[in-house]
Amino acid sequence: MKQTPAHDQYNPDLLRMIPDGLKRIVEVGCSRGALARAYLQKNPDCDYVGLEIDADSAQVASNICRSVICTDVECMAEEALAAFSPSDCWVFGDSLEHLRDPWELLRRIRNHLSPGGMIVACIPNSQHWSFQVRLNCGLFRYEDQGLLDRTHLRFFTRITMIELFESAGYRITEGYPRIFNEPDREKFLPAIRAMAQVAGADPAMAEKDAIPLQYIVKAVPVQTATP
């Protein structure tokens, strides 16, 4: 897992997606504990566990979370993950895209969720209009933050984000886009519609999918039928 710059602010939309009253939460990439602080202010009895790869950020978060482990979550042994079982919610606030194999980690987590447990995630939209413009101009240059964060290892659109969870054994039960005021996009949307039309895709859907900067989703394990 690659590290993005530390931050002291939390995503309010992500916080709203996490139900109140959960007994145990595990946040992957808790940074300095901003989201944990906000949740614990309303839910002080929650066993909020932070996993953070950056030692300095983990040290700060340890003063907020109930416990913090400085680790690369993908390198954790199964018995280490089992120590968090059962967990009501695993939170990925812009961290799934930093993983080498998010599919495998999501599959492993399924074994350690409590009945009714869930994944809550915020995922950058790689179909965003600005991403398409840069790609069209040949300017796919990594940056220190944002959609082209140099620590991003995986890129997801709305469609492939859904496929990510489904292939790992989940179904998305709730989700919505994060849309910001970006007036510059209007001059590019007609071209995005036209490109989709030529490609045989739905122009209206292509335009709609080009507007969100991120998606907030809640996913639960698919229950397998027993014989």
Can you say where each PLM-predicted feature lies in the sequence?
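Conserved SAM-binding loop
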Residues: 12-131, 157-162, 211-221
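S-adenosyl-L-methionine-dependent methyltransferase catalytic module, highlighting the catalytic core
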Residues: 4, 9, 34, 73-74, ...
